[in-house]
């Protein structure tokens, strides 16, 4: 059966790992403690800028905008991201974070975060929706040029 957004709403699954407001800039830390596995982690809605890998500067090929990052065994990455534009309600809703290793994804290695307060808003927008123009600006966020202390 093909699952739809209505199925997600009907499941009443509302647990989230973060709840930024529209326009917030946050630094997230992702740690892989899985013991022998690597995880290409995909964060929906945003492009982000990696700040560090295991407390050290990222590799040159990791310095551009990302929506997926490789997190190897016992690694920790820090990334900065902006969640849409402040005051823009089209960004509000729930978004997925998941592993792009298909066996992991198929066995529920995923969770969600919520932007704003509209938890039931369908995040599947058309190509002309203003959200698509507003959500990819982490590079210009003030702290993006410097590593955090």
Where are these regions (language model features)?
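Short beta-strand elements
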Residues: 109-121
């Amino acid at each position: 059966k093909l699952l739809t957004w209505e199925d997600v709403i009907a499941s009443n699954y509302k647990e989230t790992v973060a709840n930024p407001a529209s326009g917030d800039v946050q630094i997230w830390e992702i740690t892989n403690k899985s013991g022998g596995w690597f995880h290409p982690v995909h964060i929906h809605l945003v492009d982000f800028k990696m700040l560090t890998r295991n407390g050290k500067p990222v590799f040159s090929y990791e310095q551009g905008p990302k929506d997926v990052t490789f997190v190897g065994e016992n690694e920790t990455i820090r990334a900065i991201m902006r969640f849409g534009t402040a005051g823009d309600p089209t960004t509000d809703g729930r978004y997925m974070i998941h592993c792009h290793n298909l066996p992991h994804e198929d066995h529920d290695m995923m969770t969600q975060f919520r932007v704003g307060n509209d938890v039931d808003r369908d995040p599947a927008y058309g190509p002309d929706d203003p959200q698509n123009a507003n959500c990819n600006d982490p590079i210009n966020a003030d702290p993006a040029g410097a590593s955090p202390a």
